[in-house]
């Protein structure tokens, strides 16, 4: 499975640096000098490999220099490009109750009372914490519920069973 670790926002300056929106929990490791990332152009076209020459933090994003990208025009051509890695390349997580987003996406969600809520469509990362975007199309009318990914609400996660159990406070599931 492919995981997006960054997206090129725009060129920065005239020497070929790019501004990258971070989409990984470990940007220092992913964008370390010498690393090679797969780049998927936003406008179609073939994937290419990009070697990181340098990366530094800048306003919550990264300024990245890639091998072979030496001017603003070449950097501008990368706008919208996604940097991806294969999920098989990710290290195992040793911390309990810690997951990669792709492990949670697709899991079924139900309440402790057995009521089906839907399936995790996406994990949203906000300043206040993570939210599970849970979608359900069972009744013909699609609905989405945002569930805070906190231990007070998420009581159990079973990757083996493909299930997340929640104990929602009153009103959380009401539309």
From Swiss-Prot:
State one Pfam family annotation: PRC_RimM
Domain PRC barrel: from-to ranges: 96-172
What's a BP term from Gene Ontology annotated to this protein? Answer: ribosomal small subunit biogenesis
**Keywords of this protein's UniProt record, alphabetized?**
Chaperone, Cytoplasm, Ribosome biogenesis, rRNA processing
Q: Which GO terms describe its cellular component?
A: cytoplasm; ribosome
InterPro entries named among the record's database cross-references: PRC_barrel-like_sf, PRC_RimM, RimM, RimM_N, RimM_N_sf, Transl_B-barrel_sf
The answer to whether UniProt assigns keyword Cytoplasm to this entry is yes
**Localization, UniProt:** Cytoplasm
Quaternary structure, per UniProt, is: Binds ribosomal protein uS19.
The family annotation for this protein states: Belongs to the RimM family.
Primary role: An accessory protein needed during the final step in the assembly of 30S ribosomal subunit, possibly for assembly of the head region. Essential for efficient processing of 16S rRNA. May be needed both before and after RbfA during the maturation of 16S rRNA. It has affinity for free ribosomal 30S subunits but not for 70S ribosomes.
In terms of NCBIfam families, this protein maps to:
16S_RimM
Entries under HAMAP family matching the protein: Ribosome_mat_RimM
Recorded protein name is Ribosome maturation factor RimM
Task: State the organism named in the record.
Answer: Mycobacterium avium (strain 104)
Gene coding for it: rimM
């Amino acid at each position: 499975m492919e995981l997006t670790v960054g997206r090129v926002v725009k060129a920065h300056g005239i020497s070929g640096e790019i501004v990258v929106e971070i989409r990984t929990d470990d940007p220092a490791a992913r964008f370390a000098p010498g690393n090679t990332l797969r780049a998927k152009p936003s406008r179609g076209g073939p994937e290419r490999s990009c070697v990181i020459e340098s990366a530094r933090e800048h306003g919550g994003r990264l300024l990245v220099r890639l091998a072979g990208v030496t001017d603003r025009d070449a950097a501008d051509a990368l706008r919208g490009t996604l940097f991806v890695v294969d999920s098989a390349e990710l290290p195992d997580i040793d911390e309990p109750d810690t997951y990669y987003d792709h492990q949670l996406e697709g899991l079924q969600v139900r309440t402790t009372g057995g009521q089906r809520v839907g399936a995790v469509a996406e994990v949203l990362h906000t300043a206040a914490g993570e939210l599970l975007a849970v979608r359900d199309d069972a009744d013909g009318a699609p609905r989405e519920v945002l569930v805070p990914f906190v231990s007070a609400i998420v009581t159990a996660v079973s990757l083996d069973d493909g299930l997340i159990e929640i104990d929602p406070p009153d009103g959380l599931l009401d539309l």
